[in-house]
Amino acid sequence: MLSLLDAFSVDAPVWSAEELAARCELPVSSCYRYLKSLHQAGLLARVGSGSYVVGPRVLVLDRVARTFDPIYTVGSPRVVALSQETRFSALLSVLYSESVMCVRQVLTPDAPPGLSGRGQQRPLVAGATANVILAYLPRHQLSRVFKRHQERIAEVGLGREWDELRVTLADIRARGWCLSMGECGTGAAGLAAPLFNKDGEVLGSIGLATSMDSPRLEELKALVPEIKQAAAEISQGIAANSSLVDLPARGLG
């Protein structure tokens, strides 16, 4: 039933029961039953055409997430400060279902177009904020990602073979940061470092971004100490706050 919610996005915010049934390969009668339950729970709302949009309960859940998500609560003040100090746009991201999802965005006037906003997902195999998370995945998770996205991994230059990918990611781990140039197709350059919980498991990343044609591109490349320090401070804050749930990286299955 909850898989129906996966259909709703910025690009496709309104769905009819028939459209959802076709998309999810469900009998229309079952789809109507699921929609009734989701509507009663406030997760979906009906609009004038009889179609459905995301409901008000989602706003309640988002408020809860902003209050208790460790990356958001600990990382938000630091990512704002980092953007102000460097005058670059900044992002906090988490691993979520074979993608990287932005949980906090701070934009500067010269922000590259198409930079991720809160709740927006990007492929796990493109861009500094994604690659620096990929580098710290356990071997069994990384192997699954490689098998499912081998062509994309090769396209962005991470490696055509399994051993090549492992060498590339080992280099990222040795440095503790990642720089990318235009991998997400947005014309953006990014610099990112990983975030960890108290057990050393990767939770997400903090990143800075600018346009590839920015006159300040070399300044971005020189901010490795700053991005690593910010990541370390956030990771330490997560580990030190026992009232927050610092679970391992979101489901990768």
Predicted regions and their residues:
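An N-terminal domain-start capping segment
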Residues: 1-15, 80-102, 110, 229-253
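N-terminal helix-turn-helix
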Residues: 2-68, 72, 232, 236-240
